[in-house]
Structure formats: structure tokens, C-alpha cells
């Protein structure tokens, strides 16, 4: 055993070293958590957790997880000579809807985000045929890319969105909307906030970590697809009413409640980050609904958002007589 005298440890110096280590770990964690691929994985699992947590399974509700990504679904339809030969058709229609004793699906909830390109619209068309055959609506999502923009903030700045959607880029989209099976497709937007950034109000527990986010943008925050919020409202409606139709309006089952509100310092006080990618005006919400989308609108100065409508992608038929329309 050494008889060398140990100098007194400087506690402040040691605390400083520990603080620097925490800072280095925090920077590494920021890079991981804000990586696009990691965000997609975390968003998916937290969205599933959100739906499971909001579902009362004592109300005869079942959730089935199907492990398939968007590209695999595209390949499934491309490899099949026709839709009825696809694996999705077999699983949803043949194995359940068309089999005695089977348990038909009420709806298919997906995290998939669609754009207005040929590949995605071909996929939506194939899915709509399966959904129509099994009377099982399919829910997907659209983002800024659908509208040819980089962010949803740019989308809400489109002045005449009805005229904008008549551009040549949306010929396939408008053709799809005219199809009969389009009534079995629902596309939601924008996304909602899944969790607060880690820090004082959402501590990690094992060490001091303050997640670095820019409150003026949306990139570093963790967003969830609105399909899962709508699905949670559907399960709640089924529990309370025995069916899934009470899912619209603040008093009619459309609320998405208790959303996280992040407050950040802007130098002259605290600013609140709304739990939605963008704030939709009533006029914009109505316009998007009439264009075949299901908008999730944040209720200003509150902690909830709301689905005011639940339109399918199908374009309503117009007749000479108003009552017929």
C-alpha cells in the first residue's frame, strides 16, 4: 500500500468536470434524438404507445400491429398480377372479412406519408380497392411535400389553395378523388407534438440533460402522425357509443386533449410552442377539408387540438339540384 499523501479533492473542480461530461453527452444525445431516421422510429413507437394508452380494451376493442413499411406495401401490389392477389388483400379481406368466424377490421391506421407523385397515388389507388372490398377505411397522412413545399408553415401561406390544387401536378390526385373507392381513404394533417423536449419538465432521471431545441422552428421536436390521434378518438367513440362516428367537433368527439405545451425563453419572457406543426385558421381548415383532407386544428390558448371534419378523399358529386348534391 502506497504511503503517498492524497491531496484534498477540489469539489468545485470535480463538479465542473462532471458538468462538462454532461454537456458532451447532451450534445451526442441531441445528435441522435434529432437524426431524421431516429425521429421516425421514436415517433412510430410513441404514436403506438399513445394509441394503446388511449384505448380501453375492456370495451371489446382489439388492435393488431402489422409490421410492414410503405415500400414493402408498394412491392406487394407491384408483385401481384392484380389487387386480389396481394398479401394485404388476403390478410384484410380473405382471412377475416370473407371467412366465416373471421374478425373484420374496422379500419387500417398507418403512419405512411403520401405525396402527389405517381408512385404514391398508385399505392393509394390499390389500397382503396382493398379497403372498399373489406369496407375498412384506410387512414394515411400528407405533409408539406404533398403540396410541393418544404414545411407546413409554407403550406398555410398558399393564398388560394383551391386554385393551387388545380395545377397540372395534381391531375392524378384529382382523378383519384373522382373514383368510387376514394371514399375509403382518409388523409390527415398536420402532425401533433408527442412529447416535451427533455429537461426540467421532462427529466431523464439518470443525469442532467437539457435537450436543445429551437422553439422558432419545428425540426428538433418529436411529432406524431395525426392518424393516431384520429384513431384514438375512434376507439373512444366506440367505447362510449358503440360505433366510431362521433369523432368531429369540440363537443362531438373531435378533441385531442392534454397535448404537451413547451415554453421556451425568447429573451423578453416565455413563448409557448403550440402542440401542432402549424396553426390552421378556420377558413384554411374548411378549405383543406373540402379538398379531401382531415385537418387537425389547434385550439388557440389551450392544450388541445380538434378534428372539425372527417372527410374522405373522394370529391363530392355535384348535381344541378342542390338537395341532390
Each model region followed by its residue ranges:
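N-terminal-proximal low-complexity accessory segments that begin disordered
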Residues: 1-78
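A glycine- and small-residue-enriched flexible loop/hinge signal that marks low-structured segments
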Residues: 1-6, 33, 56, 68, ...
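Well-ordered, non-membrane alpha-helical segments in soluble/globular domains
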Residues: 44-45, 79-93, 119-130
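Structure-specific endonuclease nuclease cores
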Residues: 60-71, 76-91, 95, 99-106
